[in-house]
Structure formats: structure tokens, C-alpha cells
Amino acid sequence: MGRTVKDPNRRQPKPVQKVQLSEKNVGRRIVLVVLFLAIGSGFLVYGFMNFLRGDSGWREISVKAGSELNCSEDFTLKYNVGAGGVSAGGEAKALSLIYTDAAVKGYRLFNIDESFDDVTNLYDINQHPNEVMTVDPVLYDALKKVSDANCREIYLGPLYASLENLCMSNDDAVAAQFDPEKDDDAAEEAAAVAAFAQNPDDISMEFPGENQVCLHVSDAYQAYAAEMGYTAYLDFFWMKNAFLIDYLADMIRGKGYQLGIISSKDGFVRCLDETGEKEYQYPLYHLSGNEIQSHGTMTYEGPKSIVFFHAYQAGSPDTYRYYQYQDGTMRTPYLSASDGKDHTAASELIVYSGEYGCADTLLAAFFDYQAESLSGESLKTLALQKIYSVWFENNEIQTTDEKFSVTAVNK
């Protein structure tokens, strides 16, 4: 078995990473804890409301108690129940049922670790290369979007497994064994997988018919994967929650519910509100040196999809996607199919749109974030597609949105 084989129990709760930080990083560690709390609560600030104790008003909607395994632990759904004049209790119950069903199905569709009787999912596709399989339209559309965007990073499944091993390491010496920047074997493996991922003749998605997919994998790649013990060619990895939040939002809106907002713990947001009557806020953070600084909050009206690219840990899902060495070096999940290594153009980039979902917004901006540095001109081109950006230069906020509004932080 290859040393990057994923632990079959890796999706279960894992022990907290115990990285020994040097004293010079203590300040940053404290700030990171504060940021974890901000994002862990939904990465949202509702500047226009107070949560009501009564029957009507804004509530957090949860999945049904005792429901099957689902993806809801990564998301927060809040909804203004009763605002349309209907029973708040009845509306909350109906929303919970819709949310539960969608969260269970989403968990199963994007699962790469096990199969389920009622769906054909990523695990099934990975286990049956070169076979035509009929999948749910949600998974079909996700795979088609990534393929159409030529985002070959979805084929880096083996390297994402190795990155998780790195990030779960309890000291730098162990982590370095999985780091292509520090270990020759890891570098050789990253280069080999990247070479396969770059080449459509070695691996590619084919779409032969309606809701039909076929993961083409060459004999050479299959032989290498067998030698290394790989279990997954395909993995949405850090991109997964962008597709899941779109699915959850579409299911809720599809049932006529629009006075809500969904956020993920790693910074994705789908605001469903089309009334234009409420003002929402999104906190702005910037990593300057070793300190994560608050730069106020961006105010906006719905509907809106927000994507947060970040080169540091910012929420609980990031625990298994990022690793910080004692010297401050950070490893991130933004691996490139060009070389199998992580690349980030800046400490953070926020992109948002009122026209597209999180997945489309992410795919439109991903290559900008993987460049050597952020290009204002390139981001202006995105603005022509109604995808707007916020970033920092010399600790100053930059934006391509003429209507951008920020509430300054109190100092």
C-alpha cells in the first residue's frame, strides 16, 4: 500500500492537531482562535437584526434529531420564519425536513469513502474507472462544471489524501514526510500524480449521455495507482462545500423559501434573500505579517454567493487542510495540477456574485488565486462577468465593485 492511502476512518472526528508553536507565534495563535470562533458561528454578522426569543423571527434551522449521516455539521442555515405571515413553527419544521433530506443526500453524493444503495456517488465512480455510470443530476452538474472549467485539480485525489496525512501530523518531522517541498519521495510522488492529472489521455471525465459519466483512466495510471495503493482519483476536497452549499440553497429555494442564508464554516455563503429589504454583513480579515487583522465588515443585499480563498486556517474544516510549521511556513489545500504543490497568490481573496452560485464563482476565480500574485486587471475582467473581488494591497482594501460598502472596525 502506498503511504498516501487514506485512512478509511478519516472522515470520523479526529484528535485536535497538537503543533508546538514557538513563542513568537503565540500572538498569531490567539488571533486564529478568535477567527475560528467568528467563522465557526457561520462567518456572518447580521447587522440588521436581533434574534427574537418569540415564535417569529430569525432562527437557526437544524436537521432532524436522529437523522442519518449528513453534511450539516459544516453549515449553518438561518431563516426568518413567520415573516410571510404563515405559522413560524410550521415553517421551521418544513424547512428542517427539506434541509435534512438535502444534507443527507449531499453527504452521500460527494462521499469518496463509501458507497450507498440509493445513489451512485464519487466513491462508486472512483472504484469503476472506464465504466459508464448514471448519476444524480446534482453530481452530474458538479462534475460537468469542473470539467468545462478545465479545473484539473479535481484529479489530484491521491495528493489530497497525502495532504490530509500531513495536516494530521503531530509534529513537523512527521509532517515533512508528506511534504513535496521537504521530502524527496513526496516530491517524486507529487510530480508523478500531477503529470497524470495534467494529461487528458491519462485521466478525464467523459459525459456520454444524460446524467451519464465515465471516469477515463489510462492503463499506466491504473497500474501506478495500484502500486501506490490509491483509493480515489477524484476528490472535490476543499471545493466540495461550494458545491454542497449550492445544492442546499437550491433545494430550499426550490421549495419557495427565500428569506434565509446559509454559510459554511470555511467561508462560503449563499444569501437567498431577494427582497432587497435587509442588509447583510460579511467580516473582512487580512493576514499582515503574523497577525490576522479585522478590517470591518462588507455590507450587501441578497441574493449573493460569497467565496473566501485564504492562505491560513480560518474555520474548523481547515484543521485537516492546513498545516503550520514552527517556523511559520503554512501548507494550504490549493494544490495545482501543474506540479502537485500548493500555490496562493495572496493571504486572502473574497469573490462574490449575485448572478452565480458559489461553485461557478469559485471556478471563475480559482486560477487567479493560484497565480504568482493577484492581478487587479484580471480581477477587473471577472467583474465584467458580475463576479466581484475584495483583496488587500499594503494593508489597504482593494475592490472591483463600484457599489462596495464597508463598515469600519472600531479601534
For each feature predicted by the language model, list its residue ranges:
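Mature catalytic core of soluble alpha/beta enzymes
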Residues: 2-411
